């Protein structure tokens, strides 16, 4: 398969087949998931030595373990002897892990510690130091959110987040920090992983129509959009994208998010009081970002609705199947009752049986299923909404930015980075291809 022209210049169109091609999916495992930073867990889920969770990195499962010195390490969840899955629990606390096949035992640091009948059967031929679990070589944290990367040449996590970090820090850092409420709700959908990732990267266009019934029944601050009764007013938000594909849409002052009327007064009061405090520390603009609704995707497959408290990982299974993990995010200093109610509301709206989630899944699944059909697969998907209005170097807002609540700026940035990865054999080639990334995205010539 030829991978060079699946996305047009500036990400304006994508071949529909990218959502359903088996060969391309295998190529993505090598060029996307083995190369980029992938979300693993949060400090709040593994606070003590010996705490561990299992997570996915592409189709591979890893054990993420808090070490005795407080550091975090991650290892493939595969016994080095005969390749059996080592840990079947989603989370726990353990000094080590013993394989249920032949009983080989590994420490929480990944080292091979015990082999049954080692002397009798192997003599002195077992070199334990060479037979530890395969380790994820790079682990870094963004204000408690832990990511892993298999590629030694990748930029640091902060550099990888790029301009998106500026928008995320008001709530991830300056708010006083976040907690992740787990274990995640899990569900398998018959959709390519990119379908939900692109939707969450900044698609406000679909909200009024796709979610019309959910908006009406929930009576959230976004209910006036139901049924496309209106557009967000001018100046209601912005979109942004970055060099490495992470991007978002911002809806100003949307702190209570998609949640229903019973949560709105308490959330708006809590967020309003903190916004006033933050304005003195980080300025009015970033304090307003804290209290605004960000729908964001950290490239490639981690999505966040900040004020709605939704945190997603789109774990690929194959070219047409994705396992969706849904956590709730809450602010550390929220009252415990508000934390609980917000976490419950996340599962009601965007959990496995959530009504907003159900609205979206039909779109994702049919988009992906049609990608496997002959005529459909060869057609172009369009992402040109707002093209020509994007700017780079705005005096206030970093990244490539469009000052509109609705558009496809972040779609284009996501797929520009995607194309650069799948047509590059390593990070050096990606960087060379991306040296003029913002110029490409902000051209104003007709396409």
Curated annotation (Swiss-Prot):
Source species, domain of life: Bacteria
Domain Rieske: 37-135
Cofactor: how and how many bound: Binds 1 [2Fe-2S] cluster per subunit.
Family annotation (PROSITE patterns): RIESKE (PS51296), RING_HYDROXYL_ALPHA (PS00570)
Cofactor(s) in the UniProt record: [2Fe-2S] cluster; Fe(2+)
InterPro entries named in the record: RHO_NdoB-like_C (IPR043266), Rieske_2Fe-2S (IPR017941), Rieske_2Fe-2S_sf (IPR036922), Ring-hydroxy_dOase_2Fe2S_BS (IPR015881), Ring_hydroxy_dOase_asu_C_dom (IPR015879), Rng_hydr_dOase-A (IPR001663)
Pfam families linked to this entry: Rieske, Ring_hydroxyl_A
EC number: 1.14.12.12
Gene Ontology biological process terms, A to Z: naphthalene catabolic process
Annotated residues for binding of [2Fe-2S] cluster: 79, 81, 99, 102
Gene Ontology molecular function: 2 iron, 2 sulfur cluster binding; iron ion binding; naphthalene 1,2-dioxygenase activity
This protein's pathway: Aromatic compound metabolism; naphthalene degradation
Reactions mediated catalytically: naphthalene + NADH + O2 + H(+) = (1R,2S)-1,2-dihydronaphthalene-1,2-diol + NAD(+)
GO cellular component: catalytic complex
Record family assignment: Belongs to the bacterial ring-hydroxylating dioxygenase alpha subunit family.
Purpose: Component of the naphthalene dioxygenase (NDO) multicomponent enzyme system which catalyzes the incorporation of both atoms of molecular oxygen into naphthalene to form cis-(1R,2S)-dihydroxy-1,2-dihydronaphthalene. The alpha subunit has a catalytic role in the holoenzyme. Also able to use styrene as substrate.
Subunit structure: The naphthalene dioxygenase (NDO) multicomponent enzyme system is composed of an electron transfer component and a dioxygenase component (iron sulfur protein (ISP)). The electron transfer component is composed of a ferredoxin reductase (NagAa) and a ferredoxin (NagAb), and the dioxygenase component is formed by a large alpha subunit (NagAc) and a small beta subunit (NagAd).
Protein name: Naphthalene 1,2-dioxygenase system, large oxygenase component
Highest classification ranks of the organism: Bacteria, Pseudomonadati, Pseudomonadota, Betaproteobacteria, Burkholderiales
């Amino acid at each position: 398969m030829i991978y060079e022209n699946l996305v047009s210049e500036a990400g304006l169109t994508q071949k529909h087949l990218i959502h359903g091609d088996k060969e391309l999916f295998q190529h993505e495992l090598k060029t996307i998931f083995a190369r980029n930073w992938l979300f693993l867990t949060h400090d709040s889920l593994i606070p003590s030595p010996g705490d561990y969770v299992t997570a996915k990195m592409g189709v591979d499962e890893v054990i993420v373990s808090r070490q005795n010195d407080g550091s975090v390490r991650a290892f493939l969840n595969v016994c080095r002897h005969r390749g059996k899955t080592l840990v079947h629990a989603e989370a726990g606390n353990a000094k080590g892990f013993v394989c249920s096949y032949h009983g080989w035992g590994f420490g929480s640091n990944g080292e091979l510690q015990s082999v049954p009948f080692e002397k009798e059967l192997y003599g002195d031929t077992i070199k334990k130091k060479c037979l530890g679990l395969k380790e994820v070589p790079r682990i870094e944290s963004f204000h408690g959110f832990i990511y892993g990367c298999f590629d030694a040449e990748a930029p640091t996590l902060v550099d990888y987040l790029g301009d998106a970090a500026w928008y995320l820090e008001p709530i991830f850092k300056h708010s006083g920090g976040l907690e992740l409420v787990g274990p995640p709700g899990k569900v398998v959908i018959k959709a390519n992983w990119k379908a939900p990732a692109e939707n969450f990267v900044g698609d406000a266009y679909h909200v009024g129509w796709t979610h019309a019934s959910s908006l009406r029944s929930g009576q959230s601050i976004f209910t006036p959009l139901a049924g496309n009764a209106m557009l967000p007013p001018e100046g209601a938000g912005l979109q942004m994208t970055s060099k490495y594909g992470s991007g978002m849409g911002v809806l100003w002052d949307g702190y209570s998010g998609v949640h229903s009327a019973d949560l709105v007064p308490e959330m708006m009061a809590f967020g309003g009081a903190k916004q006033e405090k933050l304005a003195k520390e980080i300025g009015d603009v970033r304090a307003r970002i804290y209290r605004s609704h960000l729908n964001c995707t950290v490239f490639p497959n981690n999505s966040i609705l900040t004020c709605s408290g939704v945190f997603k990982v789109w774990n690929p299974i194959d070219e047409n199947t994705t396992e969706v993990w849904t956590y709730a995010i809450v602010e550390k200093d929220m009252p415990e009752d508000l934390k609980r109610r917000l976490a419950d509301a996340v599962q009601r709206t965007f959990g496995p049986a959530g009504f907003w989630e159900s609205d979206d899944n039909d779109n994702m699944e049919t988009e992906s299923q049609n990608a496997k059909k002959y005529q459909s697969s060869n057609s172009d998907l369009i992402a040109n909404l707002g093209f020509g209005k994007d700017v780079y170097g705005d005096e206030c807002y970093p990244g490539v930015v469009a000052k509109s609540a609705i558009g496809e700026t972040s779609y284009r940035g996501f797929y520009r980075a995607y194309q650069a990865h799948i047509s590059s054999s390593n990070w050096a080639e990606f960087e060379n291809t991306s040296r003029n990334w913002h110029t490409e995205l902000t051209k104003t010539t007709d396409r």
